[in-house]
């Protein structure tokens, strides 16, 4: 996009009524006039995007390829605009050239633009006041926006992750899974359902049998019922899948795997409770859950079970086994072989070997009474029941012991739907701060999940954005060799923020890393157009000085005004083409609905809005500020500072 803009600026500067014999010389002079500004504007776009490489974690992996691609393209563009473009112009731009005044489009644009710029100069306080007011309004709009780590990506599928009680049996969880799959298939938008309970056949999956994972593949949107959204489908499925003893959870397959790998949390947000005793941790986690209930945006609220697992305790009676001439190992061996099985031998089938195990049948070990009747063989007293030498009972314990940093851990899990992540967690933190004083000594809380990523990315962006502005200012200073001219171009950045803030507010987009990257790209585009305007305004000042000299006695305020208007109106068409090319490239993305458009739209929205407002500011306000600066110079120093634009 910037490459086409650079060629347009260079080409439009040759559209003058010139004799054929001086064509090459005029082309050379025209290219030299804008080459420095065009080159440095391209460099500014490159350098302003460099801080994106400072992003780390998931956001870094997502946006680094974009930054690399844009950087390499713009480096090639910066080289071509000062080497190849002049050569191509000399090859293809031949014959008779018409003046810009003969172009009907240009005449219409100038007839519209000149009264506007004269009105802005006449009502300068009103013009500046309106711009400052618009900028002031954009600040509370930005502050009122929600916050999230990354825009939610529609994967085209759902992951249903319900959990049951920790003591659920294999047969019961299988029945629940079948019932759930049957209910899910009744929704018209569902194409396929694939569910599993427990862990996969891998050593890295520690999912208990009480955890169910069901992948729901959805049909194409064209086959959905009219007006249905993904949120509506989730709500409908959730209402139909209300099964006693089962807590529902909804997410998407890819983001779920990313969350579990990066944070160890399978939901959007996890509140980790650390301590020394599992019962105390679980009791406090239940209190946290009760406080979180009713908060807008908190969905699928659930306390990870760390108690409630069922165990069979076999406590050997040492006095009794001594009476029967048995040892503890003898009793344990009987229990192990009866319940877990004992390896008897190994069978060889070809190159494969299989162990042969034996254990009691299901009917002899599926209840406490049957276990008590297990026969234990003695040397002198024959077979005796197991209950004669051991106490057998059911007890409760942790179904899984989770620890982190050598401390026991419990977790309160929930997803965020229907509200932004930042404000949801902020409200939850305010509500839970009152409970912090009631935490027992040695216990503490830690927020995890996507909120952990949000905090990290916000800290990085607070460092990146000031660096972007400093880099842009330094690049413009080296381009103009004047801090005043650099500041005049840089002032377009906050006014570009106006359009970006307005459009993301009315579009209903939350602030995220994607929006921040869009603003970073916008700042480079805004300054790029401002540099061209400053070049032509300084060119007009050169013409004024060449004609009337550079002193208070020869230059009047009226002269300054007329030459500024002439410089602003000069090459109006390529300036507007810059805006149009940017909009034509970006606007189609706003109406895209394919996979990935959820991430692209937050990047593009601030760029579209910012290009519109920055273009308005550059065309109407930049000449006004430039004129006021020159009037101040003439009044204070008796002459004006003229920037050399021909190199």
Question: What are these language model-derived features?
Answer:
Residues 1, 72, 80, 471-571, ...:
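Hydrophobic transmembrane alpha-helices and their membrane-interface caps
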Residues 1-2, 35-54, 62-101, 214, ...:
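Transmembrane alpha-helices and their membrane-interface boundaries in multi-pass membrane transporters
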Residues 16, 20, 249-251, 282-468, ...:
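Extracytoplasmic/periplasmic membrane-proximal domains and adjacent transmembrane bundles
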Residues 20, 171-265, 290, 319-341, ...:
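Solvent-exposed, membrane-proximal periplasmic/extracellular interface segments of envelope transport
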Residues 27, 31-34, 42, 46, ...:
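Signature of alpha-helical transmembrane segments and their immediate interfacial
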Residues 52-62, 132-168, 223-225, 254, ...:
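Transmembrane helices with small-residue packing motifs
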Residues 53-70, 148-151, 439, 480, ...:
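Short helix-loop junctions at transmembrane helix boundaries
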């Amino acid at each position: 996009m910037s490459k086409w803009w650079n060629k347009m600026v260079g080409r439009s500067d040759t559209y003058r009524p010139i004799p054929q014999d001086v064509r090459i010389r005029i082309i050379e002079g025209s290219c030299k006039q804008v080459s420095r500004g065009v080159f440095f504007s391209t460099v500014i776009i490159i350098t302003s995007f460099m801080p994106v490489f400072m992003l780390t974690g998931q956001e870094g992996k997502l946006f680094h390829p974009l930054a690399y691609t844009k950087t390499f393209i713009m480096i090639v563009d910066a080289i071509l605009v000062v080497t190849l473009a002049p050569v191509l112009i000399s090859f293809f731009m031949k014959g008779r050239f018409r003046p810009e005044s003969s172009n009907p489009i240009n005449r219409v644009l100038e007839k519209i633009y000149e009264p506007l710029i004269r009105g802005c100069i006449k009502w300068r306080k009103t013009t500046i006041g309106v711009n400052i007011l618009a900028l002031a309004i954009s600040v509370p709009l930005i502050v009122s926006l929600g916050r999230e780590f990354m825009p939610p990506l529609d994967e085209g599928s759902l992951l249903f992750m319900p959990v049951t009680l920790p003591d659920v049996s294999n047969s019961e969880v299988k029945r629940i899974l079948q019932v759930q799959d049957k209910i899910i298939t009744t929704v018209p938008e569902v194409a396929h359902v694939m569910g599993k309970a427990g862990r996969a056949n891998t050593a890295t999956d520690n999912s208990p049998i009480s955890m169910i994972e069901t992948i729901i593949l959805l049909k194409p949107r064209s086959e959905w019922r009219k007006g249905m959204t993904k949120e509506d489908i989730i709500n409908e499925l959730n209402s139909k899948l209300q099964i006693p003893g089962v807590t529902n959870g909804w997410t998407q397959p890819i983001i779920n795997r990313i969350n579990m790998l990066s944070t160890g949390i399978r939901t959007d947000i996890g509140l980790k409770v650390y301590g020394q005793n599992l019962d105390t941790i679980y009791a406090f986690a239940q209190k946290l859950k009760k406080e979180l209930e009713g908060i807008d945006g908190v969905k699928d609220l659930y306390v990870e079970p760390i108690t409630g697992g069922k165990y069979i305790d076999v406590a050997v009676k040492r006095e009794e086994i001594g009476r029967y001439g048995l040892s503890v190992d003898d009793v344990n061996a009987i229990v192990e072989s009866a319940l877990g099985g004992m390896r008897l031998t190994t069978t060889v089938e070809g190159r494969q070997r299989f162990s042969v195990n034996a254990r009691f049948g299901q009917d002899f070990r599926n209840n406490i009474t049957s276990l008590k009747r297990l026969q234990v063989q003695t040397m002198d007293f024959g077979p005796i029941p197991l209950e004669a030498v051991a106490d057998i009972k059911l007890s409760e314990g942790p179904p899984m012991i989770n620890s982190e940093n050598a401390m026991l851990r419990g977790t309160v899990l929930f997803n965020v739907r229907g509200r932004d992540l930042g404000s949801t967690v902020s409200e939850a933190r305010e509500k839970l701060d009152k409970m912090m004083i009631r935490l027992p000594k040695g216990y503490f809380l830690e927020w995890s999940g996507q909120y952990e990523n949000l905090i990290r990315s916000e800290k990085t962006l607070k460092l990146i954005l000031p660096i972007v502005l400093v880099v842009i200012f330094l690049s413009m200073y080296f381009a103009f060799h004047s801090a005043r001219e650099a500041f005049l171009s840089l002032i377009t950045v906050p006014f570009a923020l106006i359009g970006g803030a307005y459009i993301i507010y009315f579009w209903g987009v939350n602030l995220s890393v994607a929006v921040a990257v869009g603003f970073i790209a916008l700042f480079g585009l805004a300054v790029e157009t401002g540099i061209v305007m400053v070049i032509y305004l300084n060119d007009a000042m050169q013409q004024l000085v060449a004609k009337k000299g550079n002193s208070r006695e020869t230059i009047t305020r009226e002269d300054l005004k007329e030459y500024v208007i002439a410089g602003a109106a000069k090459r109006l068409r390529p300036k507007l083409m810059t805006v149009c090319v940017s909009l034509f490239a970006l606007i189609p993305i706003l109406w895209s609905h394919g996979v990935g458009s959820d991430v692209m739209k937050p990047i593009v929205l601030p760029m579209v809005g910012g290009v519109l407002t920055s273009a308005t500011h550059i065309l109407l306000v930049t000449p006004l500020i430039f004129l006021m600066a020159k009037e101040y110079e003439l009044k204070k120093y008796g002459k004006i500072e003229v920037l050399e634009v021909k190199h």
